[in-house]
Structures are given as C-alpha cells and as structure tokens.
C-alpha cells in the first residue's frame, strides 16, 4: 500500500502490541512519524505517551497506477516488466520514481534534523538560564545588573559551545515510525548500497547509531530489528 490511507489490521495491531511488550524499543527522546494513519496508529501503540512529530516528506511512495496491485495483477504488463528490469528505477505510471522518492525523503531528513537541533538548543538554553539564575540570586543588586548584562552578551556563544558539547557527550534515542519505502530511502542515503537492500517485514526496522557532522549524518552502526 502506498499513498492510500488505510488503518492497521487487527493482526498488525497484535504484532505491534507484542513488539511494545519486548525490551527492544527504548523510550525515545524524540519521536518522528509519517503523517499517514497507519504510522500514527503504530506510534500510538508503541509509544502511547510520547508526542510525535509528523514529517510530511516521509509519506509512503506514490505507486500511481500500480497502487494496491500485486505481481499477479501486473505480470502481463509490459511496462511493469521494464520496471522490474530497471531494478525499480523507472517511475511508476502516474506516480513517483525511486530517485524522486529518495530526494523527497532526504528533504524530510533535513526537516527532522532542524527539529532535533531546535530541541537541543532549547534544552541548552533552559539549562543555562537555570544555572545563571541560581548564580545571580546570590549577588547584591548592583552586581546583579552587571551580571545580567554580561549574561546576555555571552549567552549566544555559551549556548553554542554547550550545544556542541551536549550533542557529542549525550547520545539521544530518536525513533521514526515510518513506511518500508521510507526506511529503504533513508538508509540508502545514510549507508549507501542498493535501495532494496534495506527491505523489512511489517513491524520491523533498524537500529542505527548516527553522528551529526555539520549538516550531514554519519552512520556508525546498523542493526536490523525483527519481531
């Protein structure tokens, strides 16, 4: 299923409930989802108390005229045979190409990165304010004014240093509840290799260790998660 909105099946819900009970998925510091219904429902089962941030660009691929069809439906279609021979790189009729979809998912990765950076910056700022406020309350009034002025002048530089240190020293658990196609596209971007190397079963996924280097993510490790 691609762009068609469809709720989880009863069997799918049971699979996710089993996964939620296992000690595999850690509570995320930040939770991203595809805005499509099946991902919203999946996230609600796996992380019921966690706020989810939808990434519009992480919707499933648009399969166009092939939406909802399987091999038996298409095996006598000449263009479908060409699509298979192209390793799935030809665009779907009335839909997306693999490359278009990868680029869309990459835009979503940039959007998610911005949310991550903003959340870290807020945490750093809150920590700095609390620390500075505690120090200032112990000063006399004239000294407070000087301290407050100095604090404002130094705030941006200190926050940037603290943000860099916080990012490096405190790894965070970030979870994305998305589609199989989205997983393949993102891992193709991050790890290279063939787009179809990263296929997973329903309810499956990958655990990745990533580092943000400038504006690019670097992949340190990759492990498949299965139910």
Predicted region positions:
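Short, solvent-exposed aromatic-acidic interface loops
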Residues: 221-227
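Phosphate-handling substructures
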Residues: 7, 46-107
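Long, intrinsically disordered low-complexity tandem-repeat segments
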Residues: 136-137, 141-167
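Short beta-strand scaffold positions
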Residues: 33-34, 103, 177-178
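Short, low-complexity, charge-dense intrinsically disordered segments
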Residues: 123-128
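Domain-level recognition of soluble alpha/beta enzyme cores
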Residues: 194-218
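Generic beta-sheet signal
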Residues: 29, 170-180
């Amino acid at each position: 299923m691609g762009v068609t909105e469809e709720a989880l099946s009863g069997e799918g819900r049971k699979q996710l409930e089993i996964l939620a009970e296992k000690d595999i998925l850690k509570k995320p510091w930040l939770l991203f989802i595809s805005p499509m219904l099946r991902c919203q429902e999946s996230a609600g089962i796996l992380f019921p108390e966690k706020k989810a941030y939808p990434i519009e660009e992480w919707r499933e691929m648009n399969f166009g005229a092939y939406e909802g069809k399987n091999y038996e439906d298409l095996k006598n279609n000449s263009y479908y045979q060409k699509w298979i021979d192209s390793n799935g790189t030809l665009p779907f009729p009335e839909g997306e190409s693999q490359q278009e979809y990868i680029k869309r998912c990459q835009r979503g990765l940039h959007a998610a990165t911005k949310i991550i950076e903003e959340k870290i910056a807020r945490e750093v700022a809150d920590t700095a304010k609390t620390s500075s406020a505690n120090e200032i309350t112990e000063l006399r009034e004239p000294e407070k004014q000087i301290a407050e002025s100095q604090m404002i002048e130094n705030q941006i530089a200190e926050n940037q240093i603290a943000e860099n240190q916080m990012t490096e020293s405190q790894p965070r658990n970030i979870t994305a509840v998305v589609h199989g196609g989205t997983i393949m596209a993102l891992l193709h971007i991050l790890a290279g290799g063939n787009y179809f190397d990263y296929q997973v079963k329903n309810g499956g996924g990958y655990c990745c260790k990533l580092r943000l280097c400038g504006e690019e993510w670097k992949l340190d490790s990759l492990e498949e998660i299965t139910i």
